[in-house]
Structure formats: structure tokens, C-alpha cells
UniProtKB/Swiss-Prot annotation:
Pfam families reported in the protein's UniProt record: 1-cysPrx_C, AhpC-TSA
Top-rank taxon: Bacteria
The protein, known as: Putative peroxiredoxin sll0755
EC number of the protein: 1.11.1.24
Family from the record: Belongs to the peroxiredoxin family. AhpC/Prx1 subfamily.
GO biological-process terms attached to the record: cell redox homeostasis; cellular response to oxidative stress
Cellular-component GO terms for this entry: cytoplasm
Role this protein plays: Thiol-specific peroxidase that catalyzes the reduction of hydrogen peroxide and organic hydroperoxides to water and alcohols, respectively. Plays a role in cell protection against oxidative stress by detoxifying peroxides.
PANTHER family with a match to the protein in the record: THIOREDOXIN PEROXIDASE, THIOREDOXIN-DEPENDENT PEROXIDE REDUCTASE, MITOCHONDRIAL
Assembly and oligomerization: Homodimer; disulfide-linked, upon oxidation.
Keywords, ordered alphabetically: Antioxidant, Cytoplasm, Disulfide bond, Oxidoreductase, Peroxidase, Redox-active center
Top-level taxonomy: Bacteria, Bacillati, Cyanobacteriota, Cyanophyceae, Synechococcales
Reaction(s) catalysed by this chain's protein: a hydroperoxide + [thioredoxin]-dithiol = an alcohol + [thioredoxin]-disulfide + H2O
Length: 200
């Protein structure tokens, strides 16, 4: 029986082969302890929505590293398929060189552990997870296969997580962006925030 994946609990560890800088390397979740990690699953190589997501995260990779965050992509394809896709030009449907590892989950064990495996199709749904420096799952979202995710929203949530972890007496309200007002979760102290957003 698969354990229930819960925000606030340790993220399931894994060890797998990945493509890193066009070479085969072993990647472990525990390697990223001490940094934040954006871990995202996608259905298959050589498809349609998937390359748009992978390229977008790669092109904005520096924005994640500036936040002490690594990015890792995972699908049920083999590492050989990942490599072939990376070595295919973007104009031909490939992804070209990317700035983070692509992990092979050929046995589908990682997808199962993160509860994103679509059993009938045998592929992963578009799950995205943000794991903190202690290896604790802080955020989880899963899309159906036909629509992609937002790099902007991932960065927004990541910044909110970092903020509340460095300011544990504060919480971030709806649509919070870096630099916006936060609130203190206390009936009296929260009034300071609500007074600033109240309708005239």
C-alpha cells in the first residue's frame, strides 16, 4: 500500500540515473539537503506540452539558483531517451542543453512514491513539488496531462515558502509577491494588514 504523501512530512527519498550535462550520473534526493528543490514530473519525452515546460524552467534556472534552489525533472523514460531528446535541436522538437538534471524513472517507483503515476497510461501526471532545506515537502500540485505549469507561480510560491520559514511569525496572504505586506496570524495584530487592504 502506497503511503499518503503529505505536505509537512519528509519527501520520499530516491536514487536514480539522470542526465546531467549530457552525461549519466546518479542522483539522490538526499544530495539536495541544505537547499530548496523544485521537483517536477512530466509524462514523456518527445511530446508537446512537456518541452515547453522543461525549456521554460531551464531558461529561468538562474532565478531559482539565486534563491538557493535546485530544479530536477523526472519522467518514466529511460536515460537514453532523455539524452537523445537533449541532443535534438529545439526547432526539431528537442529540448537542447538544459541547466538541470532529467531523472529516469523507468521502473516508475518514484512516480508511485509521489502519487503521480497514472496507472492506465503508465506515465506520470504533471506533479510539481517544492521541498525545503530539511527535506520536508512544503508544496504539491498535480495537473492533468493536457495543460502545463507556470514558472512564475512556482517562483512566487517558492519565495513565499522561503519568507515564512525565515519569518516564522508571519503568513503570506493571497497572491503574495516578494515585497508585499504579510500578516501576523493573531486576531488583533492581523488588523494591521486588513486595514491596508480594506475597501474605502
Amino acid at each position: 500500500m502506497t503511503e499518503v504523501l503529505r505536505v509537512g512530512q519528509p519527501a520520499p527519498d530516491f536514487t536514480a540515473t539522470a542526465i546531467v550535462d549530457q552525461s549519466f550520473q546518479t542522483v539522490k534526493l538526499s544530495t539536495y539537503r541544505g537547499k530548496y528543490l523544485v521537483l517536477f514530473f512530466y509524462p514523456l519525452d518527445f511530446t508537446f506540452v512537456c518541452p515547453t515546460e522543461i525549456i521554460a524552467f531551464s531558461d529561468r534556472h538562474s532565478e531559482f539558483t539565486a534563491l538557493d534552489t535546485e530544479v530536477v525533472g523526472i519522467s518514466v523514460d529511460s536515460e537514453f531517451s532523455h539524452l537523445a531528446w537533449i541532443q535534438t535541436e529545439r526547432k526539431m522538437g528537442g529540448i537542447g542543453n538544459i541547466n538541470y538534471p532529467l531523472v529516469s524513472d523507468l521502473k516508475k517507483e518514484i512516480s508511485q512514491a509521489y502519487n503521480v503515476l497514472e496507472p492506465d497510461a503508465g506515465i506520470a501526471l504533471r506533479g510539481l513539488f517544492i521541498i525545503d532545506r530539511e527535506g520536508i515537502l512544503q508544496y504539491a500540485t498535480v495537473n492533468n496531462l493536457s495543460f502545463g505549469r507556470s514558472v512564475d507561480e512556482t517562483l512566487r510560491v517558492l519565495k513565499a515558502i522561503r519568507h515564512v520559514q525565515s519569518h516564522p511569525n508571519e503568513v503570506c496572504p493571497v497572491d503574495w509577491q516578494e515585497g508585499d505586506k504579510t500578516m501576523i496570524p493573531d486576531p488583533e495584530k492581523a488588523k494591521t494588514y486588513f486595514e491596508t487592504v480594506a475597501e474605502p
